[in-house]
Design a protein with these regions (language model features):
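Acidic, serine/threonine-rich low-complexity disordered tracts
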Residues: 24-114, 163-268
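Bacterial N-terminal signal peptides that target proteins for export
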Residues: 1-9
Length: 268
């Protein structure tokens, strides 16, 4: 007689664990495919600094993203990322490289499969690598958050706040790879001038959840990402530090132009 209740309890426990697992990952509601674009990188005041090229494609059942920014003085920034979209959105690789006239200046990378992250800054002669705690399907870096938000859009528009993990690098006390909890939320509908056009976008906020002690030593600004409105939700604008928390805050626009305007609340 005792076996049946125990069996039922075991079944319920397994069911709850399965539900918890599925709830912690991001269901792909907006599958990404082949795309090619030419974004612009600006300072926070909208002055254009670099021409960009965005490439995205599917290969070996993986989504690949390469974004390159070329500056007039010979600087080149390049971001690369790889994702799995089934059974849930999962980032597998990410890297960011800054070079000048072909020579590497700064490099940051994270292998989500092995759990290793690394950083290199040439001028400071710093090279670090560290094992990081990756939660598959919940840990992202760089453009990965734009893809994650496009699939979380309906939930966030409905008022839900979703916590994810972000791979970052702290300059204090040393150049250390870290995984930080971030809260994603909806900030409102904005309009912004871009490449001579007035466009609308939904603003989403990525807020780092730092401990009180950490806040005493480092200030990590929120990152803002705008997705196109109305749906389907595609990338429109990104604002945040280049890489480290104390880096200059920059803006990346979907459409490249000589001048980029600030985002302002849409008057309904």
């Amino acid at each position: 007689m005792l076996a049946e209740p125990k069996l039922v309890a075991l079944f319920l426990l397994v069911a709850v664990e399965c539900l918890s697992l599925s709830a912690s990952t991001i269901e792909v509601t907006e599958p990404a495919g082949a795309a090619h674009g030419y974004p612009g990188l600006c300072d926070i005041n909208g002055k254009k600094l670099a021409d960009g090229e965005f490439r995205q494609w599917i290969e070996n059942k993986r989504l690949h993203v390469v974004i390159t920014y070329k500056f007039s003085d010979g600087d080149v920034y390049e971001e690369q990322a790889q994702f799995q979209q089934q059974p849930a959105l999962t980032q597998e690789k990410w890297s960011w490289k800054e070079s000048k006239n072909g020579a590497s200046q700064r490099e940051f990378a994270a292998d989500f499969l092995s759990g290793m992250a690394s950083a290199h800054i040439r001028k400071d002669n710093k090279d670090v690598s560290k094992k990081i705690d990756v939660e598959p399907g919940r840990t992202f870096a760089g453009f990965g958050f734009s893809i994650a938000l496009s699939n979380l859009r309906k939930r966030l528009l409905g008022g839900e706040q979703v916590q994810l993990k972000a791979v970052g690098f702290s300059p204090f006390p040393s150049l250390t790879p870290q995984v930080v909890t971030v809260t994603t939320s909806y900030g409102g509908l904005d309009r912004m001038r871009m490449s001579g056009r007035l466009l609308k976008g939904d603003r989403f906020i990525i807020h780092p959840e730092l401990s009180i002690i950490a806040k005493l030593f480092v200030n990590v600004p929120d990152t803002k990402i705008w997705l196109t409105n109305p749906a389907p939700a595609g990338f429109l604008r990104w604002e945040g530090p280049i890489m480290l928390p104390d880096d200059p805050i920059i803006r990346v626009d979907l459409l490249s132009g000589a001048k980029s305007g600030p985002a302002e609340p849409e008057v309904r």
